[in-house]
Amino acid sequence: VWYEADDIAGTLAKIGEEEGMEVTLVTGDRDYLQLASDKTTVLITRKGITQLEKYDKNRIIEEYGITPEQFIDLKGLMGDQSDNIPGVPGIGEKTGIKLLKEFGTIENLYENIDNVSGKKTKESLIEHKSTAFLSKKLGEIIVNVPLDCSLDDLKVEEPDWERLEEIYTKLEFNSLLSKIPEDKLSNKGSTNYLYF
């Protein structure tokens, strides 16, 4: 079984929630909106990383009219070119959201396919049923990846400044070397290095 970085992030977010933490995910990937909940907030980067847009469960419902969990179904319907997920031809965000507001999930949509209005939409859904389900599966972030570490193992600790100084010096990473706090340098305050 293969997992993506999204799956690791989703699993860690879920573990954090289960341990009573408030979780914040910072990403440029809108796929993460499916992870928003009462305890998980998603910050979407804008214009590089200079602006962040905050999404929690309530904002997603207000803005899109669907729940975070339904974003998986939306991706199944409309696909995602950036992730090579095909979706159903002719179904974009607007139509996908409309269908999910009416039917809730892809599964319920197909159970009630005769109630779908719009001849072209219904025909495309029928013709591309397997693609819709495959796209949903591909778009879902897995939140139960078996991890061999705990959240405590992932805590950020004080760097090994001496080792970093050694590596940066050897590789001549002068700009990184200059960022080591002076009181952590082996030469205590001397950032003047000569390289030949």
Located regions from the model:
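Extended two-metal-dependent nuclease catalytic cores across DNA- and RNA-processing enzymes
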Residues: V1-L147
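Cytoplasmic/organellar membrane-interface segments at the starts of transmembrane helices
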Residues: D152-P159
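Long, highly charged low-complexity segments
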Residues: D160-F196
